[in-house]
Regions:
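Cytosolic nucleotide-utilizing catalytic cores of signal-transduction proteins
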Residues: 1-160
Length: 160
């Protein structure tokens, strides 16, 4: 009988002596979490690949950081969970491609009109206006929601 297992690995920066082991462990743990949040699949990730997540993971975080953008993105994530849709992924790709309908539609393998319909639905659900809202705030909110999903409900992170 052949068993298949999915393995994720988080890599820290090089530790130079016992004094840096605790920091190295935290970096590796954060990189491991990054495989879930950034890649969405098991794999290998180095701490340096985390980008802005390095900073978000260092903040005290219990999901209680609330603002209108985070609440809006959380509504999209909840809608996706309940209906097995991918509106949050659509929003992420749209932001990643700096609002390009063509590039986002291509990345998602959908027709541009389908993308426009999804963006309208995102606006209806969340109250976000992607023509006016601060995209950086929306991007940070998306990352915070993804981190909370990866940490699981009710898990609390203390500052390190």
């Amino acid at each position: 009988e052949k068993l298949e297992a999915a393995v994720s690995i988080g890599l820290s920066n090089v530790c130079r002596g016992a004094a840096s082991f605790a920091a190295g462990f935290e970096e590796a743990r954060h990189a491991l979490l990054g495989t879930t949040v950034l890649k969405g699949t098991p794999g290998v990730m180095a701490y340096e690949e985390l980008g802005p997540y390095k900073y978000l993971l260092r903040m005290p975080f219990d999901g209680g950081v609330r603002d209108a953008h985070r609440d809006a993105v959380a509504r999209i994530a909840e809608y996706d969970r309940q209906r097995s849709t991918a509106l949050l992924r659509t929003l992420e790709e749209f932001l990643r491609r700096r609002g390009s309908i063509g590039a986002t539609a291509e990345a998602l393998y959908v027709h541009p009109n389908t993308l426009r319909q999804r963006l309208r639905r995102i606006g209806e659900l969340s109250g976000l206006d992607l023509r006016k809202d601060d995209w950086l705030m929306v991007e940070i909110a998306v990352k915070m929601v993804r981190l909370q999903e990866a940490l699981g409900p009710g898990e609390r992170r203390e500052p390190k």
